[in-house]
Regions:
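Active-site metal-binding motif and surrounding structural segment of the metallo-beta-lactamase
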Residues: 92, 114-164
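Cap/insert and terminal regions of metallo-dependent hydrolase folds
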Residues: 2-4, 235, 239-321
C-alpha cells in the first residue's frame, strides 16, 4: 500500500488510541515511563541557546518519493534503525541574548498527534514564563512549528511576543483563494495556519521578516525557500561565534545528507527545496558552521561534513553546564 501525506497524517493522529500493557504489578519499583532530558544548553558567544524538544514522530521512507527503497534500507539499518521508517524529532530553540528572549518556532501544540506537544511543559521546566518571551521568529508556517503559539485553551500563549514570519509564507498559507484550490489533504495546513496566526495578527503582534534583516541584534533571517515558499533560517551571531538555526533543511539526517536530492512529501516546491539544501550543505560544510535543526536528533546541534560526493551529519559533543 502506498503512503500518502493524507494516510500518514491520519495514522499519526490516530496514535492516541494505542493501548499499553503495564508490567508495573511485577516490578519492584514503578517504571518511570518517559524521558527527562528535553532541554539542552548551548552557548554562542555571549548568547545562550536552549534546544527544546517537542517530541517525535515516525515518518515512513515512502514519504520520500524519490528515495530508492533498497538504498534507504541500507542506510537506516547501518544506523541501527528500522529499514522502512525514521524516528523524526521536533525541536524548537530559545535564544537569550541577555537583552531579549527569542523563540525560534514553538513545536506542534495539539495539532500533530499525541507524541508531540511537549514544548510548553519543557519551557515551564526551565522556569520560563511565556509572558517574558519578546520575539518569536518562525522558520515557516507548518503546524509542527507554530502549534505551540496557542495554549491549551486556544488562546495566545505568548502575550507579549512579536511574531516574525516571512512575507512569502504569510501570503501563501493565509490566502483563502490558494487554500480553496489545493488538494483536500493539504487544506488542514492552511486552516491551522489561519487558526493559530490569526489571533496574533488580530492583536497586531505579527511582523514580516525579510532576508538579511535582524529580528533582534545578533539574529539575522536568511531566506531558504522550497520546503515552504518563505522558509527561513536564522543566523545567531555573538562574540565571533555563529549558530545557524536552519528549520527544515532536512527531515532525516541519515538519508538526506547522503542523498540531498531526496525531497520529502511535505515540500511545497521539491526542486527548490533540493537546490536550497545543496546550497546550505555546501555553505555549512565549507564554513564549518554549527547548525541547529528542527528535525535533527535531539538536541539537534551539530555539523555537516563532506563525505565523498555527498555529506554526513556529525552531532556536536554534549557538554555539561
Amino acid at each position: 500500500m502506498s503512503v500518502t501525506r493524507r494516510s500518514f497524517l491520519a495514522s499519526a493522529f490516530a496514535g492516541s488510541s494505542l493501548a499499553f500493557v503495564s508490567g508495573g504489578a511485577l516490578a519492584k519499583a514503578p517504571f518511570y515511563g518517559h524521558q527527562v532530558l528535553s532541554a539542552y544548553r548551548h552557548t554562542v558567544g555571549a548568547f545562550e541557546v536552549i534546544a527544546l524538544n517537542d517530541g517525535a514522530i515516525e515518518i515512513p521512507v515512502a514519504m520520500y518519493p524519490k528515495a530508492d527503497p533498497a538504498e534507504a534500507a541500507r542506510i537506516l539499518e547501518a544506523t541501527g534503525g528500522a529499514k522502512d521508517k525514521i524516528p523524526t524529532p521536533v525541536n524548537a530553540f530559545l535564544v537569550n541574548t541577555g537583552d531579549k528572549l527569542v523563540l525560534i518556532d514553538s513545536g506542534a501544540g495539539k495539532l500533530f498527534g499525541p507524541t508531540l506537544g511537549r514544548f510548553a511543559a519543557n519551557l515551564a521546566t526551565l522556569g520560563v514564563d511565556p509572558a517574558s518571551v519578546d520575539v518569536i521568529a518562525m522558520t515557516h508556517l507548518h503546524p509542527d512549528h507554530f502549534g505551540g503559539l496557542l495554549d491549551t485553551q486556544g488562546k495566545i500563549a505568548f502575550p507579549n511576543a512579536e511574531v516574525f514570519v516571512s512575507d512569502a509564507d504569510l501570503k501563501f498559507w493565509l490566502d483563502e483563494a490558494i487554500a480553496a484550490k489545493v488538494p483536500a489533504d493539504n487544506k488542514p495546513f492552511f486552516d491551522q495556519a489561519r487558526m493559530v496566526i490569526g489571533p496574533y495578527a488580530a492583536a497586531k503582534k505579527t511582523s514580516v521578516i525579510a532576508d538579511g534583516k535582524e529580528v533582534v541584534p545578533g539574529i539575522t533571517a536568511m531566506a531558504a525557500p522550497g520546503h515552504t515558499p518563505g522558509h527561513t533560517m536564522y543566523r545567531v551571531s555573538s562574540g565571533g561565534e555563529t549558530l545557524l538555526i536552519w528549520g527544515d533543511i532536512i527531515h532525516s539526517a541519515a538519508l538526506q545528507t547522503a542523498h540531498p536530492d531526496w525531497a520529502i512529501a511535505f515540500d511545497t516546491d521539491p526542486a527548490m527545496a533540493i537546490a536550497t539544501r545543496k546550497r546550505v550543505f555546501d555553505m555549512t560544510a565549507t564554513d564549518r558552521l554549527t547548525i541547529a535543526g528542527a528535525h535533527v536528533p535531539f538536541p539537534g546541534i551539530g555539523h555537516v561534513v563532506k563525505a565523498g560526493e555527498a555529506y554526513a551529519y556529525a552531532p556536536s559533543y554534549w557538554m555539561p553546564g
